[in-house]
């Protein structure tokens, strides 16, 4: 994009993009996305750098040591003059509000939260699962909990639940034990547990008590995380936005949304829940324009252009 907010190219590159510690950084994949979007603007990577500022909002940038590590890795490719790295949660927050501060919550495969105060102070969480004290941490957890509930209902350790039937049906087997065995023998990728999250919401909508209990646990962890950030930044008496982004928030479960709203408003009555309806890349682009001190008209133009411009060359 240009500093006046014109979109010069847009690409969705569906490839391996895990920058978590201990993984081989997917720099070639990221470079391919940059090459393709630059080509739309008539720029080749041979004429590096391709931009003045590169704003990278990446999953896996969870700790300060991650920020330093990934920044070094990206700078080593010389794609842009100035590398700015953020966790993807900051893109969610910026895409959902023009205040410049507030709270952003991402709930997809995992759960994370970042908050910015009106004075610029930042609160973020490691979001490393059980390792960092997270409890009901996102859609991956919800899927695993669904399998656990199905197994416990079947063997008598827990209450009966419609998940006993719905979980194995999703994977085209007859018993939840078969799903467990497939995971144990690595015949089934553990990442596929995320596919069960919509099943839990469907079961809860049908009146399944155990599914509703799991959804309530997830909502309560979202509330606890957001409220911790709100208290730490002393936002409890202020008016601000809480932006909710990620696949879990695209469900249509009114009780889930209401529980989150009521739980946060109990601590911060002036908080307004906003479900993100724009792609997170809008937030990354706006953060880039913020860094360039672009005019408000440029930011408004960017929002409008990205809203009407499909992300090209989907893969």
Positions of PLM-derived features:
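ATP-binding/phosphotransfer module of carbohydrate and carboxylate kinases, centering on a glycine-rich
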Residues: 1-45, 49-51, 75-76, 95-101, ...
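Conserved helix-loop-beta element of the AMP-binding
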Residues: 53-55
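Solvent-exposed beta-strand sheet faces enriched in polar/charged residues
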Residues: 57, 86, 241-245
